[in-house]
């Protein structure tokens, strides 16, 4: 007689108590993800109302950087406070940041609200994934992970709609306030259905504060320099960020508490993987920060339409990931190399078509939309295979660290990329001279810069493919 584990279906995930638990977990990710697209959609309207174009990219950079810190706090928060209290703390922080954004009279207050939002949102995001193993049987884990991850696809539909409608009505603040009742319902559900205790021993592990502080400082260095249009100050910010990242690598190699698996700084083992992941991730998540603004100013689109057009890259990323999941192992090298090529082609197309502007007719927008889709789809095609290789190449004792590092690297490159995008846009004239001419010049330089980033992704992907054909070193 053979033992076998029954395959759990979607019906099992939504049966009885599992249904309300599932809704609670997806609620945390949905709130975080929808908020991302709401903010991106309404940001052009926000700066038109309260000013702060110089700090445009800071809204994303600070939000994502705070999300990294929030997600890093979750393991200790779960073990010491328990799931129920952890969710309550995360929801209260997120709500405080959301209300601050909705009441912000100026950009500095808005940025403070976005940082608070990011801290709470990062907690909710990490809690949702961490809770899966606690509240569900192992047979349900793949379904639960798929459901939670799918909320990003839902967010690409819901976020731009909420942000766009309120922006067009001239009440952008209500876009943030509209999240308040949802946060309240989510909190009540969490307090009702989640366990008080996590079932695991209290964690006494120290957080990797030196590395987290250096990551944050690197993003802030670039962001601070980007405020000025002076080349010297911007170059100084970039140089300081590079120095901080080199220091981070030194600290990480010697630290007893690491944030990356062993071998992460070896090109032959994990280094090329992380570089490719970082370059590709930044090319999508950072460039799309300015896309709604470009569509509104240069192509005569409403906030609602601009928000949806900006979400094309994210939606195509999801479709690409789904479509490539069944690709045979022998063909993944070609897929990994294809993604950066698609990125370069798409970015060059955007650099040519977006700056001149148009009246916004469908035939003007169609090639731009195709370019956006090509970029996102290419990253999506290669994403599952990059993650799979990271898990395979990481040492056995580093498997949990490898899983967590993917999210951290993606978030960090998004934050750093947004800061760099803000620097390039400001230097290219987004704020001075501003207007149509300044925005067009910023778009040209921004997409040209991200084309270079995609080209660098090809270089690292080529190194990755070549290293896969050679014996792997144990660590570095």
What do these predicted ranges mean?
Residues 12-21, 206-208:
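N-terminal membrane topogenic signal
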Residues 18-35, 39-41, 51-62, 66-75, ...:
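12-transmembrane solute porter fold
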Residues 73-206:
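Helix-loop-helix hairpins in multi-pass membrane proteins, especially solute transporters
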């Amino acid at each position: 007689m053979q033992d076998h584990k029954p395959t759990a279906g979607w019906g099992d995930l939504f049966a009885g108590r599992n249904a309300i638990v599932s809704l609670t977990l997806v609620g945390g990710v949905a709130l975080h993800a929808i908020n991302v697209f709401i903010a991106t959609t309404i940001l052009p309207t926000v700066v038109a109302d309260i000013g702060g174009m110089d700090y445009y990219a800071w809204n994303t950079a600070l939000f994502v950087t705070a999300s990294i810190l929030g997600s890093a706090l979750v393991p200790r928060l779960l073990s010491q406070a328990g799931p129920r209290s952890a969710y309550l703390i995360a929801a209260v922080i997120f709500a405080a940041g959301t209300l601050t954004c909705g009441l912000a009279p100026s950009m500095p207050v808005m940025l403070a609200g976005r940082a608070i939002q990011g801290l709470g949102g990062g907690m909710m995001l990490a809690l949702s994934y961490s809770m899966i193993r606690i509240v569900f049987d192992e047979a349900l884990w793949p379904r639960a992970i798929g459901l939670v991850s799918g909320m990003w696809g839902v967010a690409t539909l819901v976020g731009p709609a909420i942000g766009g409608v309120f922006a067009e009505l001239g009440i952008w603040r209500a876009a943030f306030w509209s999240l308040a009742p949802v946060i309240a319902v989510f909190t009540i559900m969490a307090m009702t259905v989640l366990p008080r205790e996590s079932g695991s021993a209290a964690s006494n592990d120290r957080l990797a504060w030196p590395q987290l502080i250096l990551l944050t400082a690197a993003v802030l260095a670039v962001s601070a320099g980007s405020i000025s249009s002076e080349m010297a100050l911007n170059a100084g910010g970039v140089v300081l960020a590079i120095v901080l990242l080199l220091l981070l690598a030194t600290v990480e190699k010697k630290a007893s508490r690491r944030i990356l698996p062993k071998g992460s700084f070896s090109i032959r083992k994990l280094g090329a993987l992380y570089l490719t992941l970082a370059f590709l991730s930044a090319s999508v998540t950072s460039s799309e920060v300015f896309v709604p603004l470009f569509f509104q100013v240069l192509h005569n689109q409403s906030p609602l339409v601009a928000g949806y057009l900006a979400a094309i890259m994210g939606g195509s990323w999801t479709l690409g990931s789904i479509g490539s999941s069944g690709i045979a192992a022998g063909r993944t090298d070609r897929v990994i190399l294809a993604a950066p090529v698609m990125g370069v082609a798409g970015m060059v197309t955007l650099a040519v078509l977006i700056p001149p502007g148009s009246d916004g007719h469908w035939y003007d927008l169609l090639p731009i939309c195709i370019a956006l889709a090509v970029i996102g789809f290419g990253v999506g095609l290669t994403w599952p295979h990059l993650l799979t290789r990271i898990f395979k190449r990481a040492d056995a004792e580093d498997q949990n660290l490898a899983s967590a590092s993917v999210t951290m690297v993606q978030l960090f490159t998004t934050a750093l990329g947004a800061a760099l995008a803000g620097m390039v846009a400001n230097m290219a004239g987004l704020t001075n001279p501003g207007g149509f001419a300044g925005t067009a010049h910023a778009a040209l330089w921004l997409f040209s810069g991200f084309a270079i980033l995609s080209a660098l992704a090809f270089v690292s992907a080529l190194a990755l493919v070549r290293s896969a054909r050679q014996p792997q070193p144990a660590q570095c």
